């Protein structure tokens, strides 16, 4: 019996080798990336207007941290960071719009959770902003801690993780509050400003952004309490893994670029670098782009268009911006934070 099996296996070897060879370096299959190329434009879902993250200006152009992620993807895939159509979405609309194919990718301060990924058929393409839920109160309340908020009316936006977490937090601390949910960020902030509620809760970065919209920003205080982990990042549909990989690795490329010292100011030097890890990143060695179905210089395209992660952060939300948010956990792992990305190799 064994004498018959061995020749059979030897006969199958060439076919198996061909099959494995075909599977090893298959570029991105037909799907979202092909639709984006045929259309010539990336359709990216963003917020309806959040300072520092996705903000539409008077001339109808967009800017912000999440906007730059969209532009980086467009640069990697289409070679032009300007080829993006931005679709403003409320928290309640965002995942439905993605699931129904109305947008190619969601870059809208969205928290990665089990329910959203497994329950909604979505894939979160890594974390690009480590946040946490916080509280903003009127300064004249003289409150210094969330543990002093018993009996308060709390404003929260519907369709966010904060809506459930605020009840969990106060319940766990044996405190009673009245939670009022609003359909969008604008109405939530309006309710806070007109004192329909005396507390507003959302991601801490969002509180910094929303406070700037108040007629008297100095009249509001952001408390030091952080009551949750809110890992934010871009989102794709789960039915197109090739596209998910592209979005994920563009996200990772921006982080890796900062770690490698590659920025929008030294693209030419990166292309000539003698360092193996920089050469792989730049596409000079390795031919890694074809595994994603992209040109070998895909990562450099992204960085050239919007800068590395550090540049994006500081320009939009960092200490040099209107928001002035310290990097904190969003500092590189080698600099005291927890931000890191798998290597490009």
Question: Where do the protein language model's features map onto the residues?
Answer:
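Bacterial N-terminal signal peptides
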Residues: 11-24
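Sec/Tat signal peptide C-region and signal peptidase I cleavage site
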Residues: 25-30
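Extracytoplasmic small-molecule ligand-binding "clamshell" domains
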Residues: 35-109, 294-298, 305, 309, ...
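Bilobed "Venus flytrap"/periplasmic-binding protein-like clamshell domains
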Residues: 43-52, 62-77, 111, 131-183, ...
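Ligand-binding cleft/hinge of the Venus flytrap
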Residues: 57-58, 71-82, 124-126, 162-181, ...
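Extended ligand-binding regions for polar small-molecule ligands
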Residues: 68-71, 75-77, 139-143, 147, ...
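Acidic, polar ligand-binding/catalytic clefts
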Residues: 71, 75, 79, 83-148, ...
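Short helix-initiation/N-cap motifs at beta->coil->alpha
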Residues: 84-96, 179-194
